[in-house]
């Protein structure tokens, strides 16, 4: 079978979700020269806020993820910088790209060794800072704008931070829980949900 241009990026994200994606989430949109970029941060296992540094798991420091998305091929930071708070627990920590937008398309980095020349460090407050040379819009076969995904360096190859399924009954139909949050099909692919065909099925 012929792979689509998006195959490697999607496969890399799905494989690494169970290794890195957990904890609280923060999303923000910054504007540079009238064009927007979205930053989405997951703080890591058991880390629910940017300020939390206690009550965390052994895997907390080596989990978490940053996703950067711009939907404009002309996006540019110009002379500005983009600062993203990864959380205080991640202060002075090394991060590497998992996916990186380039003029040749989205490049995937399966492990720390593959991304050895692309390491960035957070500051004493846990901020990652990007310059205009690092983030800019592109028009390629798999991207019109910019996409970058960053993860902590040093996670074991077999790290799995997924939460075990829960059969606990809740009063509300939709509730945010760690167990629910671990389910990719619920979060990202709601088009797989079945729809009723008659009133009696409600």
What residue spans do the PLM features occupy?
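Carbohydrate-binding surface patches
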Residues: 30-89
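Intrinsic-disorder/low-complexity loop/linker signature
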Residues: 24, 34, 81, 104, ...
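Aromatic- and carboxylate-lined catalytic core of secreted/periplasmic carbohydrate-active enzymes
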Residues: 1-51
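Solvent-exposed beta-hairpin/edge-strand motifs
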Residues: 85-104
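Short hydrophobic-aromatic micro-motifs
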Residues: 1, 65-69, 150
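C-terminal beta-strand-rich structural cap/linker in extracellular carbohydrate-active enzymes
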Residues: 111-200
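Short, surface-exposed beta-strand/loop "edge" segments at domain boundaries and coil↔beta transitions
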Residues: 46-51, 73-79, 103-108, 136-141, ...
């Amino acid at each position: 079978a012929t792979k689509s241009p998006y195959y490697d990026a999607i496969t890399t994200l799905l494989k690494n979700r169970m290794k890195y994606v957990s904890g609280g989430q923060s999303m923000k949109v910054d504007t540079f020269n009238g064009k927007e970029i979205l930053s989405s941060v997951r703080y890591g296992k058991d880390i629910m806020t940017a300020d939390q540094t206690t009550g965390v798991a052994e895997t907390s420091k080596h989990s978490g993820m940053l996703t950067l998305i711009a939907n404009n091929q002309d996006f540019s930071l110009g002379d500005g910088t983009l600062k993203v708070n990864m959380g205080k627990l991640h202060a002075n920590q090394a991060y590497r790209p998992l996916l990186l937008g380039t003029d040749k398309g989205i490049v995937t980095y399966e492990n720390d060794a593959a991304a050895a020349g692309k390491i960035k460090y957070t500051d004493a407050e846990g901020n990652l800072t990007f310059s205009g040379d690092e983030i800019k819009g592109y028009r390629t076969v798999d991207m019109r704008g910019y996409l970058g995904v960053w993860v902590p360096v040093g996670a074991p190859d077999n790290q799995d931070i997924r939460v075990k399924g829960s059969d606990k009954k809740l009063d509300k139909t939709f509730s945010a829980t760690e167990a629910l949050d671990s389910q990719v099909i619920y979060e990202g692919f709601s088009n797989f949900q079945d729809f009723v065909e008659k009133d009696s099925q409600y």
